[in-house]
Amino acid sequence: MVNSLRLGDDDLVPVDYTDLLDKILGVLQSQNPFSRSSDNYRLVIDIDAIANEVSQLQIIPPLGSFERQAHSATVNFPAEVEVRFRSQIRQIREYLRQHLETILGGDDAVERFVASLIVPLDSTYFRGGGTELGFKYNFPRHSTLEKKKLTLQRLDSSTRAILKLHKLTISVRNSDIFQQQLREGLKKYINENTDNKEDRENLTDRLDEIVQDESSNFHKLIRLVDKETLGKLNKEAKITYLEYLLENIRSNSTDRVGIIYLQDLIRRLRLIEEYISDIDKSDGDYEVNYAGVRVNYRDIFSRAEVLDILPIVPIVAGYLGESTDTHRSERKFIFGLKIKFDNPVQARGGDDVFEYNLNLLNPDSDEQKTELAEDFNREKFVRKVLKIALLYYFVFASRSNPLANDYNPESEGNYQPRESFESVVMPVLSGSDEERKQQILRGIIRGLNQYNIKVKIDRLKQLLKGFLDRETILPPRTESRHINIKRGILEQIDDTLTTGKFFNDILERNPKQALQYITVENARVNPRAICQLPVNITIEDIRYFPTDERQSFSMEYNIKGINALPVLLTPRGAISKDTYAKHFNTKLVVFRYENQRLKSDGGLPPAEAFVYKFTMLLLSYMCLKILAENWGKNLFIPMVRLHEGDHNNPSPSEKFMAHLSKTLSHLLSEKYRCNSQGFRIKHPPKKFTIGNGLSSLYSILPKKFRFDNVQLSPELDNLAIIVVSSRESDARKGNANRFQRKASLIGEIVGINRQEDGSIQVEMLKTFSENYSVTHLYTQPSILEDAMSQLYEQGYRNFAYISQAPYTSTLHITKTDEDEDLFFMSKSLIRTLKGERRDIKIYPIFFDKYFVRSFEQHRGESFYIQDIMELSNLADDPNQESVMFFNLFNGIKVDQQGDKNFYNGVISYSTLLHIYQGILDDKDIHQDLIYDGLTKDTLLHYLTIFHFSRYEARQNISLKLDPYERIIGDDSVGALSIFSHTGGSANFNSLAFLNKVRELDNEVDNNDW
């Protein structure tokens, strides 16, 4: 059988799982995955054996020959494939149901047996101390919880600050007239380079044509500047921040050597910019190649993130606001700053950043050999290797050894890395002798080790940390810069006269490569620039001070009426077998699997691994749905995972099962409640580890809060929190049009309700996920529309609608529909949520995390900050678009090897102002989120207790810093649901796929809450 996939008009790669599903059906016909224990206490499900057998069969790849054209491909079914898919899924479900009935004795027996496994959570069956592996827990009441208020204002001169934030503000002027300036710059170029009136008139007419044509390269350049320049400004801000620190350290430190190292780091970073921007060099002078992959250094080092692989480098982290001043034609972007301190990299079992990247650079390392052997990842890896080679050479190459007896730190400033790089390294990397290239890379590593560069890095780290720990408040600093569009992006005037093209072909082929012609430089007139935008970069030292305001409250579980169906995911290894026998001899559903299937050495090859994972996720989901189908929202499915691997040497199979359990938990929580938690058992886990794990497992259960002397707004007796995110499921490589993609809308709804006894209950109402074209994702997603209707029917009138910050990447130069940049905060989507319901309030809120340095230890303490950082003129400024109104901080530092715990995270909440005229009442947003008052206090109180409700520790309870991590971020269900297709070059979104499967289950009843 050969699939007959053809590319359609939607510019997406089609998928066809027909053959794979047929193979699953074939194996499933003859194998029953279900068995039960002799005491009838456990249902054992062996999907692993079926998945492994299916993986050994010859299967037509779901993407046919088109995989390399797809960035992701999951649910873009041709019509005829869709029909077969629905039939096959129903057939698989029927086979599973029949197998289950076979071992249990008929249809009614399935329901009876499942009922025998389900136990009320408040029964003695689940009661225990919470210190032993298993499901027993004491569901403790916490009666002495407290939150404390911090403020930006020092109450008196003796008050010591608790937190330090370094704030970055980037102010861009004239962005609203950039198109006009670009046109004038091109007209000036025409006038300077044409000899006669006729040529000038012809080219001016041609210029007018491309200005009018929205699809022209003129507008492509404008869009490129709009979307990519803020990243380049952030890159410049990183170096400016180092200069800011150096300026203040010089007058406050006696560490002469450390100061020299910081000064030299800045010098070398500037040398890279000078080298890449050298006007006397052509693009070809930067061409290098390695392992068959060609790279242009000018292109690579024009990217915003290029410095981030350094061991010590500032990081722009955390979105703090954004505003527009139309009178001054100025737009401000506000961020947090922190420094990366050569932290350990988990992927290498604790190697720090410097050693990790040297290992990638090393031609003899296992990592480089493995990556170069895999075609699908080779280009990306080689780009990284060549980037490390230049960056580490320019920043660290030296002839001065800090451990030598005659070492003179001043000599560091005399070394010129550019000269030796151009004379020694570039001729080799631009040539064709692969052996010499490997020798050069080995030589770079040898030199960095021989001259003990790590000693210098550690000294610099010590200097910066010591300075950042000081309590002296630093004065602000503002630096002026220009964004320059260089003439190098233009064709020669004679060629333009012949072809009518003003711009280099690079803008047509790959716009991002044209970033090399967009530079950020010191503020001065540049005759080689087509046009310039003025920019200010401001760095400020912000402090948070304690106050006497605090609130006390208690928290307890409300598990009455909740029934539990425990599930265990366990490897077949000896350690797991012993743990299972000792701690899990109880009522539960058991999924057993072989944890060696996916190991890199001797495990399944990539194509077979995809088939195995696909089969595991499909059948495990369908099995659990069959077991739970007759139970309502009061069913809780706690999943416990046993892991024989450890943090430094995790099992790939166990990691996959962890990700799978998160995906299953999200899907099942649409109708029930489900959560998963893993326990590492290579060594017997400690009691507090078990307690924290069980607390995490049960963190989504309803909780009731009681307060002392807290006044709440009578208008806010309830609040629904709706959290949304998305994850791409289908997209073509090289297609920059994000509207020609498909994605999964992912979310969660939490209800906060005031009870008759005066307590406040917080509970997860449901999760949701559904697939959409991106065109509809941010405008009229029906799943959100339905959720709002259902919440309204349940009595909710106040809605905190939360997503991650949408305003972080563009200068907003283009005059396109502003909804494109608002994503989940688009006016179209907010209008959909509002509908015709005039008696509801929707608060558009987005959150982010920024980082601060804490001067004290605050274990188990919780703080809130509700000062408005950018308060000036807020009431009178109709152009203010985004303002941060609330911050939460818990003082907890992560105990782990290295220095990742130097900073503390702070969660920020921001809202959008003057965006939704005619849809939402802007007065509500001002009065309820911005200005102090009872309504604002109540809303922020509700948000705070939601953070407390998601705590994942058994003792020293404080608010959970990021309660949205299941929906948004690197550890979200959307991120964890991704794995590679058979060829390894395209992504498969398992959540999006199961959404498609779930559609069949929900056809009869998709409104059951």
Residue ranges of predicted features:
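Long, contiguous domain-sized segments
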Residues: V2-R477, R481-R487, K501, D505-N510, ...
